[in-house]
């Protein structure tokens, strides 16, 4: 089995050669502990329960998911999907995520030149785009959203009603659409928010909020 083989490789200090072989069937599955994929590597599915995941620059993985831990995707890496329950997700520059980026309790940051084919979503935590492109929309319940300068979002933006028992804050999520950014599709708000839109940004129909215009870099 692949997992057994990987354990033997690790035991003999040969994991680096396994990564270098470029085997996209090489799955890594752990319960306790972090996963680090070196630069310029090709692997399959990455999964851990208690630990973070880091994927090196210019590497490729099929997917990465963790329960308690963050995920870092270094510059130039590619992957199908990223998912965590308790932890943040940071996607570096010029990365490609074919499908989705999802968190429950954690922030999500997409840096310059990154492209996500599907949606980007969380429940609690900020979502920030820095000159990035998202093809399947943005969604949160309690987090702030910043669609930074020169970012593009297709599929709209949605802030859901917060029905969680433990979340008692009356703070309104802050939504900022930055200079020369584009959000195509409906901006739908199921709870009160503060919505700020640059006078050079382009957005679709707004439901449930009153946009406040601003000029300059930030409101």
What is the meaning of each model-derived region?
Residues 1-219:
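Intrinsically disordered, low-complexity terminal regions
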């Amino acid at each position: 089995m692949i997992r057994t083989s990987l354990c033997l490789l690790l035991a003999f200090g040969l994991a680096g050669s396994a990564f270098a072989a470029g085997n996209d069937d090489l799955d890594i599955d752990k319960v306790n502990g972090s996963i680090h994929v070196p630069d310029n590597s090709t692997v399959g599915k990455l999964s851990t329960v208690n630990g973070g995941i880091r994927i090196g620059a210019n590497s490729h993985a099929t997917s990465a998911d963790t329960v308690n831990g963050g995920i870092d995707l270094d510059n130039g890496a590619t992957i199908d999907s990223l998912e965590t329950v308790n932890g943040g997700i940071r996607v570096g520059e010029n990365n490609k995520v074919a499908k989705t980026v999802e968190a429950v309790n954690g922030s999500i940051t997409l840096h310059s030149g990154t492209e996500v084919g599907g949606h980007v979503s969380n429940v609690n935590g900020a979502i920030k785009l820095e000159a990035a492109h998202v093809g399947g929309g943005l969604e949160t319940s309690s987090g702030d959203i910043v669609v930074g300068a020169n970012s593009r979002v297709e599929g709209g933006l949605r802030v859901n009603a917060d029905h969680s028992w433990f979340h008692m804050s009356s703070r309104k999520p802050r939504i900022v659409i930055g200079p020369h950014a584009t959000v195509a599709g409906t901006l739908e708000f199921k709870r009160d928010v503060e919505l700020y839109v640059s006078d050079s940004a382009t957005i679709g129909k707004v439901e449930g909020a009153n946009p406040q215009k601003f000029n300059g870099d930030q409101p």
